[in-house]
Amino acid sequence: MKIFLSRFLIIFFTLFFVSKSTFATHIVGGDFKVTMTNNGATSSNYDIQLRLYRDDVNGIVNMPSTVTIGIYQIGTNILETTKVLYLDNNIGTIVPLGDACFSPNPAVIRVEEGVYNGLTSTVLPNFSMGYYIQYQTCCRNASVTNLADPDNDGISIFAIIPDPALGQNSSPDFGNYPNDAY
């Protein structure tokens, strides 16, 4: 029994001290799109979409099938509600990068986009200060050069829903824009 226990402890401590940590180094960016679908007298309806971008070459984690966002009152920071958003078709898509002058090597740079939507519109009581939406996740990618410790730094994605009394207001839509920014 002593031999078994001593061998077990040697193997355990060897694995414990020699094993390498694994990090989810995959997130490279994201943004929210908020569309007001109904501006009511006491509450308003919004469609909320999150686009999340991950490194498909160096990342070791797949896109999550769902994400949970928080919606908070501006000024009070009170959590109004949380909302689960679902990955469209349960799969991300590889985004085209480059242009006529430059085509990056897909073995070095390949970005996957996950588009998340709610199953229903989000109904929020009209609040004169408005709301902010946030999503947080870990971790960034070592290819992000403007962070001190990207392997351990997360990302916060943020959007503001202004006071509905200002009129029907949605986030700006500039059409398809270059994904090379991510």
Q: Which residue stretches match the model-derived regions?
A:
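Long, compositionally biased, intrinsically disordered segments
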Residues: 22-182
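Bacterial Sec-dependent N-terminal signal peptides
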Residues: 1-28
